[in-house]
């Protein structure tokens, strides 16, 4: 594939500007929209060009992962945090999938699973394994996959699994930079089959790359990834822990804060853009997102407390490095050219959390042991 053949990045907003002239170009694809990967050979100069078509895809059925509203329960004053029974918060949920009586054992198992060597990528695989791939290229790829996931209405769990498959595969196999996009769409195909009710077809993933790769290319790479990962696809992700951590984080608010959960999701998706976060396990990334989200919402209060420490198993000091990286991502001091996640969370359906202000500095007192 020559440099001229490598397609340039197209965003949803740019595609809309060309929609009126593009409808008649390809009759068979009139309802599709390509989201084209940025230039990997020169990641510092990503041009924005309009795409051929604007897609109006029929919405696919979604699983309702959101629990029904919790019933009103009389409790002690908010300032008093009861640590006597760790099952209290879990037992309040009306969602039977939370498995209140067994949740502590379940999460203990998930913590053991997330640190297994087969489940973890190498923290420095780009330096040790890859010869042609850079951290910036990985960032461009993940940012583009966020757009693809939005285009095909894929869940965040699918996105996290996709990135996990990519990092694990690149920890084992050397890949030419011209094949990096192929690794990305094939990993997303695998994750979609694992997670989604109606996953996109192989043709859809070929089309989203502007037919840079054939069906045979995608299927062959899919097989290569599955063999390299030894078909071990299920693993805990950030979402696995975030569901529980956000419920604990809401406990000391007088009323549930509407922006807390989408803000945690935004910070979590920002975190996967940066190669430096590969070394962190999902539970630590989730806890760091909760820590920073609480700081953004209530900047004058300490974002951590004994209950969060008890449920997450992390002290504030354990989160310092990870929180610092995500904080820099939030302020665009890292990965500022990667805009897909930022644009996604500016929408009203996510409470416009990407526009919330935050202090440029984190107080050093945050990393001391909490006694509240």
UniProtKB/Swiss-Prot annotation:
InterPro entries: Cyclin, Cyclin-like_dom, Cyclin-like_sf, Cyclin_A/B-like, Cyclin_C-dom, Cyclin_N
A single GO cellular-component term on record: nucleus
An example Gene Ontology molecular-function term: cyclin-dependent protein serine/threonine kinase regulator activity
Record carries keyword Cell division: yes
Keyword Cell cycle tagged: yes
Domain of life: Eukaryota
One GO term of the biological process aspect: mitotic cell cycle phase transition
Region (Disordered) location: 53-73
Keywords, comma-separated and alphabetical: Cell cycle, Cell division, Cyclin
UniProt similarity note: Belongs to the cyclin family. Cyclin AB subfamily.
PANTHER family to which the protein is assigned, alphabetical: CYCLINS
Protein name as annotated: Cyclin-A3-2
Species annotation: Arabidopsis thaliana (Mouse-ear cress)
Lineage start: Eukaryota, Viridiplantae, Streptophyta, Embryophyta, Tracheophyta
């Amino acid at each position: 594939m020559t440099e001229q053949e490598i397609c340039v990045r197209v965003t949803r907003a740019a595609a809309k500007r060309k929609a009126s002239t593009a409808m008649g170009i390809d009759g068979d694809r009139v309802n599709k929209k390509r989201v084209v990967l940025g230039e990997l050979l020169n990641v510092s100069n990503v041009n924005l060009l309009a795409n051929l078509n604007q897609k109006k895809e029929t919405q696919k059925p979604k699983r309702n992962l959101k629990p029904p509203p919790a019933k009103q329960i009389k409790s002690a004053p908010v300032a008093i945090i009861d640590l006597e029974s760790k099952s209290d918060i879990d037992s309040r949920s009306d969602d039977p999938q939370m498995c209140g009586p067994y949740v502590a054992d379940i999460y203990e198992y998930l913590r053991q699973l997330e640190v297994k060597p087969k489940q973890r990528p190498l923290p420095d695989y780009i330096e040790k394994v890859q010869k042609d791939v850079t951290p910036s290229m990985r960032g461009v790829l993940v940012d583009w996959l966020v757009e693809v996931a939005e285009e095909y209405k894929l869940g965040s769990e699918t996105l996290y699994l996709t990135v996990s498959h990519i990092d694990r595969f690149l920890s084992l196999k050397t890949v030419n930079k011209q094949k990096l996009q192929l690794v990305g769409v094939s990993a997303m195909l695998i994750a979609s089959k694992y997670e989604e009710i109606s996953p996109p077809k192989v043709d859809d993933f070929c089309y989203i790359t502007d037919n840079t790769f054939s069906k045979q290319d995608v299927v062959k790479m899919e097989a290569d990834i599955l063999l390299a990962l030894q078909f071990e696809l299920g693993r805990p992700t950030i979402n696995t822990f975030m569901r529980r951590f956000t419920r604990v984080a809401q406990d000391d608010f007088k009323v549930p804060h509407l922006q807390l959960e989408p803000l945690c999701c935004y910070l979590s998706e920002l975190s996967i853009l940066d190669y430096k976060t590969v070394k962190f396990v999902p539970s630590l990334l989730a806890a760091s997102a909760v820590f920073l989200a609480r700081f953004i919402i209530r900047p004058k209060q300490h974002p951590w407390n004994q209950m969060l420490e008890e449920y997450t198993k992390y002290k504030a000091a354990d989160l310092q490095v990870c929180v610092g990286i995500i904080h820099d991502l939030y302020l665009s001091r890292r990965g500022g050219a990667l805009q897909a996640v930022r644009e996604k969370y500016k929408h009203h359906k996510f409470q416009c959390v990407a526009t919330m202000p935050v202090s440029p500095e984190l107080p050093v007192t945050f990393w001391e042991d909490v006694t509240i």
